[in-house]
Amino acid sequence: MNFGRVLTAMVTPFTDEGELNYDEAARLADYLATHGSDGLVVCGTTGESPTLTWQEEYELFRVVRDAVAGRAKVIAGTGSNSTREAIEATKKAAQLGLDGSLQVVPYYNKPTQAGLYEHFKAIAQASDLPILLYNIPSRTGASLQPETVAQLAELETVVAIKEASGMMDVASEIRRLTPSRFAIYSGDDSLTLPLLSLGGSGVVSVASHLVGLQLQELIQSYIRGQHDQALAHHLRLFPLFKVLFIETNPVPIKAALEMQGWRVGRARLPLAPLQPSSLQVLRQVLEEMGLLAESKGSEQMATKVS
């Protein structure tokens, strides 16, 4: 399974009352599929999966699937710190005809490497849906070691990893130990270019909500051997990469999308809105990069109607 180069970790839109805004989710998915995203990761970290019910997630999977209509891969965030839950959710995603599943390292219960291997192996054996492993120790409290990744890469349906430890030594060791068919995606926009130099395939991106086409050009420039051009793209986008993590993700990206006219709403509690000082910095970066020049989403539709 080739998921592509730019996979957008899609936000989950909410109404003012905090309910799922499925209509806006469909509009956003449609937009992303035509603006640089090869795939959409639905209900991952950026999609606020810890605050969603499984029924909300399943309906969102269906809505996004229908909205992109085959123009982009749809990868379901069906990971859990309960192996049984992860299996059940992954089977449901497969029944819905999605293209893959994102399987986060189990959080809170801090399993050993042996436990992590058995967890992912059980999911892989329960469904034919291709698996994108997700290593993010800063959030889970446990790290999937390169040797364990290499073991898992021997399983037919374990095809890739979203490596978000932020450590290039870890990515290097994963690349050294796994076959070339096993894809490594950066879990941080700012590390996309460095990871490409280590044999990475692309990025699971937050910034691609705003600059998907530019991220594609960064990656394609590198692949074409135009490394100076790729670096120029990276440096131009770098302030955006950093400001989108000025506070806990996905709070800044949702604020940025709201500024553009998307009705994605606030993050659900316990995540709080951006502090005024952070909001000011975010707006300044977006204005400097010309990302607030035209309205998008529901606001754009309202303007056209009027």
Swiss-Prot record:
Name of the protein in its database record: 4-hydroxy-tetrahydrodipicolinate synthase
Active site: 134, 162
UniProt xrefs under Gene3D superfamilies: Aldolase class I
Site feature: Part of a proton relay during catalysis: 45, 108
Pathway(s) where this gene product acts: Amino-acid biosynthesis; L-lysine biosynthesis via DAP pathway; (S)-tetrahydrodipicolinate from L-aspartate: step 3/4
InterPro entries to which the protein is assigned, alphabetical: Aldolase_TIM, DapA, DapA-like, Schiff_base-form_aldolases_AS, Schiff_base-form_aldolases_CS
GO biological process entries: diaminopimelate biosynthetic process; lysine biosynthetic process via diaminopimelate
EC supergroup of this enzyme: lyase
